[in-house]
Every structure is written in structure tokens, then in C-alpha cells.
């Protein structure tokens, strides 16, 4: 219910129809006009592209070197076997990848129930057919690599990345990680009191059984909400640039006059005038220094030459001298 004309209607879940264990229809209303397509399309795209899942990515079949081979005693060719494995619905708990094995001989069909796995793996449809053996002496042995991921990654995009480390006979499979087999949405008319221009969103979805349809919709809505959080509070989130602070005084000015290695006579004259740092010295003029007892023109020339060798001179003006670091001492 709206409190004012400026408020937006808040939708609510009206109905969740469980058609089967993997097929669900969800109805959401009322939505403001146009919001049905806005939300429906966004959720549909996220459900198709961003739901995590598990998929077969690599297969090794004894006696098979490439996907265009055939195996004696097996009804299907290798390409068809790979397509059947691509459609395998499997869940892996606690790790990102695992290796399954399959070894069967004798006439009969080979299904997902024949796959050997540990307790961290769950085969959703054990009746899923992988291939058929047509000869009593026929046998097939394979190793199946299953990985966790998101979206769809074709085998062609991984060929160059894994070419050096991939052993001969290791067949790459297009990885379809998405647990969503089919999803569609429909926008119908809805009504609230006198308003008849509202939307009703109906989402119909089928999964491969590795995820509950309701959980998939909740997860997609969470992803959408998290991606939109940045727009709720728009601000500059760039890292602040830290500029290196330039020291208030050149380091040489903070050094004691003893570092100038003056003669003993000149050094003693400066200390008698309480000139302890080079910064104290450069602020004095020639006239001021000549008034210092026992400091003559020879000592003055020595001081000027030593300062000049360090790109300094007498009569310099230093604002805010002395610095607090010297005062604290």
C-alpha cells in the first residue's frame, strides 16, 4: 500500500508453484509499470550467467587419443560420449575440483550410477546414460575431472592455457557450470485498488537438480542487490593519493656545525655564540660573524668556502627556524 503518490509499491511473493523437483514457477506482484521487465530481464540474465555449479571439464578414455575417435565395442563415438558427460549433473562439496573414475565391461548401458566417487560427490541423476557397450569382450575405462565454476567456458578458450601441461589423450569438454537448464519470464497485468496499470512478474525456471529453484532465485536477487549497492550511496571511492610530505628544512640544515669539519678556532668561536647547527650558521651575516670574539677574516673565509661546497651561504632566511625537533632537544 502506498503512503503517498511519490512512494513506490513494494512487491510481494504471491505464489510459488512447485511443478516438479527441478521446475518452479514464481509469481511476484504488484510492481510499478515497467518494473516487471526491468527486474525480470535482470534476474533472467543473472540466473543464466552467474549461478555457480559443477561441470565436467576434462576426460581421459583408455585407448582414445582425440575426440574424433571411435572405440571398438562402444555404440557411441567419442564426441557423443563427451556430450553425454557434459550433461552430467553433479555436486561437489568442500573442494573446487575432483577426479571421478569409471570402469565397465560387458554388454549393457553405462550410466552415471557406474561412476566411482567419494563421499564429497553427489550424482544427481544416476540413470543418466553415458554410452552403451555392444560386445561381450568390450570394456571402457575413463577418468573424469569435475570442477566448480560459473557460467559457460568453451573448451577452445582453455586449449592454449593448458596445452603445455595437458597429457596426450586428455580431452577438454565445454564446461557448462550453470545449473539452470531453462528460464523464462512473463509480465502480466496486475491491479491494486483503483490502479490497473501495474505489472505482475511470473518467472518459470528449470534446473538440473543441483540447486533448488527457489534458492537459485534468492541467490540471483542477492547478487543483483549487491551489485546495486554502489549506486545507493554514490561517492568517490577511489583510494586517496598520499603525497610524500616535503621536509620543512633541508636535512643538512639540521646537522651540527661539527659536521663542517672547521678548524678548532673557528668551531670554538661558533659554539661560543650558541651556533650549534648549520641552520643557525647560515642565518648569520658576515658582519655578525666578524663581531664574534677571536673570529677573523681568515676564519670567515674558511666558513664561507665550506658552506659554498655544500651549496649554502651566509645570510640565508629560514622561516620557522628552529624546528620543533631541535627545540625538544
From Swiss-Prot:
SUPFAM superfamilies: C-terminal domain of RNA polymerase alpha subunit, Insert subdomain of RNA polymerase alpha subunit, RBP11-like subunits of RNA polymerase. Its EC number is 2.7.7.6. Pfam families: RNA_pol_A_bac (PF01000), RNA_pol_A_CTD (PF03118), RNA_pol_L (PF01193). It catalyses: RNA(n) + a ribonucleoside 5'-triphosphate = RNA(n+1) + diphosphate. DNA-dependent RNA polymerase catalyzes the transcription of DNA into RNA using the four ribonucleoside triphosphates as substrates. Homodimer. The RNAP catalytic core consists of 2 alpha, 1 beta, 1 beta' and 1 omega subunit. When a sigma factor is associated with the core the holoenzyme is formed, which can initiate transcription. This is DNA-directed RNA polymerase subunit alpha. It comes from Buchnera aphidicola subsp. Acyrthosiphon pisum (strain APS) (Acyrthosiphon pisum symbiotic bacterium).
Amino acid at each position: 500500500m502506498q503512503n503517498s503518490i511519490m512512494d513506490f509499491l513494494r512487491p510481494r511473493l504471491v505464489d510459488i508453484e512447485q511443478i516438479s523437483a527441478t521446475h518452479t514457477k514464481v509469481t511476484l506482484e504488484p510492481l510499478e509499470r515497467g518494473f516487471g521487465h526491468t527486474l525480470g530481464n535482470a534476474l533472467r540474465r543473472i540466473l543464466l550467467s552467474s549461478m555457480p555449479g559443477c561441470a565436467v571439464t576434462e576426460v581421459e578414455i583408455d585407448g582414445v587419443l582425440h575426440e574424433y575417435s571411435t572405440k571398438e565395442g562402444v555404440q557411441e563415438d567419442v564426441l557423443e560420449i563427451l556430450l553425454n558427460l557434459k550433461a552430467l549433473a553433479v555436486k561437489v562439496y568442500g573442494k573446487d575440483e575432483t577426479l571421478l573414475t569409471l570402469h565397465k565391461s560387458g554388454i549393457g548401458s553405462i550410466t552415471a550410477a557406474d561412476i566411482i566417487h567419494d563421499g564429497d560427490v553427489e550424482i544427481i541423476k544416476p540413470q543418466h546414460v553415458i554410452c552403451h557397450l555392444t560386445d561381450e569382450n568390450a570394456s571402457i575405462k575413463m577418468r573424469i575431472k569435475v570442477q566448480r565454476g560459473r557460467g559457460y567456458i568453451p573448451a577452445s578458450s582453455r586449449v592454449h592455457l593448458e596445452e603445455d601441461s595437458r597429457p596426450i589423450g586428455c580431452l577438454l569438454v565445454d564446461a557448462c557450470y550453470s545449473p539452470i537448464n531453462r528460464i523464462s519470464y512473463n509480465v502480466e497485468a496486475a491491479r491494486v485498488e483503483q490502479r490497473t496499470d501495474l505489472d505482475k512478474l511470473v518467472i518459470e525456471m528449470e534446473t538440473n537438480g543441483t540447486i533448488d529453484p527457489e534458492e537459485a532465485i534468492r541467490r540471483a536477487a542477492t547478487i543483483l542487490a549487491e551489485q546495486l549497492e554502489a549506486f545507493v550511496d554514490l561517492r568517490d571511492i577511489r583510494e586517496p593519493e598520499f603525497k610524500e610530505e616535503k621536509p620543512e628544512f633541508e636535512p643538512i640544515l639540521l646537522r651540527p656545525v661539527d659536521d663542517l669539519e672547521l678548524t678548532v678556532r673557528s668551531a670554538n668561536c661558533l659554539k661560543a655564540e650558541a651556533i650549534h647547527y648549520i641552520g643557525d650558521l647560515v642565518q648569520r651575516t658576515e658582519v655578525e660573524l666578524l663581531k664574534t670574539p677571536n673570529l677573523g677574516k681568515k676564519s670567515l673565509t674558511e666558513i664561507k668556502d665550506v658552506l659554498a661546497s655544500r651549496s649554502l651561504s651566509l645570510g640565508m632566511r629560514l622561516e620557522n627556524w628552529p624546528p620543533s625537533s631541535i627545540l625538544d632537544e
